[in-house]
């Protein structure tokens, strides 16, 4: 089937779904048709824009063949042809991108987890910097950033921290942030002015709803214990801390941030559900090895993806060879869009090349 035939088939399907919805269908049939209709809407808009430009180009070329035009009119026609010829490849690419298989998780909210890696206290301080950077980015996007848990070192660093980020298409924007982030800078405690290298690991998980992942009570082991603060001292006289283990997968989440055991359990279940959903999602992707070849980076938490070099004021993304000399804007102000949009574009380009 040719590209044009495929587009015509999609338009026919969209029109037929519209007629079906107008015919008064009810129940599950209506829900299914409404979902399909909504999913096709974006690509149909792009197909119509592409077809319109294609038709206008054909008309302009035919018009040009007519006799009797003065030079000024002919120049105007040729300008229009030139504009349309330049726009067609862009419009065609937009259609193809809209036709790419969608990641079901892209529209979801996300849970972000940041953990200090190699580098001791400096790594923990960097983990806190990254966590705050994502909080500012969420604020810029108008998303809701809810801190789930923070394990701090007592002097400003985070051993680990997690947050729920709610909003439209959050996961599609943040999913490429998973991996190892490396920092090169002179620690405040360094008297010799030597540059230290340390790292933190970021994991971005699509936030799963109960309809996505059904967790049976019989599959959970829930342990409670007293919360402890920095240095291990007990800060609570009640067993408010919660550790939940999902027995079939072995995934464990421990939380002690809230004074209420009930609140800790609710937050832990939210993180657990996201981790199980992400594991299932990754297993499915692994089965589709051919499509996985087209992804930007593996999304593996052990993959080094970005370096933040403070002395040089640069941030470098190693997957797309993009370096920006604006470290304060990125780290302090959360201006990540230049990296994120470039990563999305590169991912789309790789997938398009495999069509």
UniProtKB/Swiss-Prot annotation:
Stretches for region Disordered: 281-308
InterPro entries listed in its UniProt record: PCRF, Pep_chain_release_fac_I, Pep_chain_release_fac_I_sf, Prokaryotic/Mito_RF, RF-1
Compositionally biased region (Basic and acidic residues): 281-293
Record's comment on post-translational modification: Methylated by PrmC. Methylation increases the termination efficiency of RF1.
Pfam families: PCRF (PF03462), RF-1 (PF00472)
SUPFAM superfamilies the record matches: Release factor
Modification sites for N5-methylglutamine: 233
GO MF annotation terms: translation release factor activity, codon specific
Keywords recorded for this protein, A-Z: Cytoplasm, Methylation, Protein biosynthesis
Annotated GO CC locations: cytoplasm
Record localization: Cytoplasm
Major location category of this protein: cytoplasm
Chain's role: Peptide chain release factor 1 directs the termination of translation in response to the peptide chain termination codons UAG and UAA.
Family, similarity comment: Belongs to the prokaryotic/mitochondrial release factor family.
Name of the protein in its database record: Peptide chain release factor 1
The species this protein was found in: Rickettsia akari (strain Hartford)
Gene that produces this protein: prfA
